[in-house]
Amino acid sequence: MSEKHYAIVLDTGKCLNCKACTVACKFENNVPVGDEAYRLWVTEMPLQGRFPHLHQEYQPSQCQHCRNAPCQAVCPTRATYTTSDGMVLVDYNKCILCKACMLACPYDARFVSLQHGAVEKCTMCIHRVREGREPACVETCPTKVRVFGDLNDPSSQASRLLASREWFRLKEDRNTKPRLYYLR
């Protein structure tokens, strides 16, 4: 059997900006509440249409878990690494807080964690995934914006969505090859 290739597929048209994903992430990963440090966030996109027919969309985002991760390439201590199934992680014990990875990340998805004394980012809830569970942001979303799955499994919901819908990845011109896919 081939290795797993985890990814998250996002249907942003379903996002209500309820922040359940952000709260679940902070709680699951012990990120201090109220702190400006976020492993994921939701951006309000510009209003579309004309009054009275206006439409608001939101774009959830987080670390893109890139196949060609610039943060990993610049890390002098190799604290940033990629697991065999595609998750880009940080070994807090190796991080020297040089912040080179923060500067290299085109998605602005890293922050300094005083709790860990290291740069921190989304882990795609690897601890949950290893237990056979979904990341907290995926599980908690009331409108099911995020779908987590193994793209090497053609029967996974994530694979089926990508096969049946048009999609894009953020900042594709940077050649980072993100593992987050946004449905059109």
Regions found by a protein language model. Name each.
Residues 1-184:
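Non-ligating segments of multi-cofactor redox enzymes
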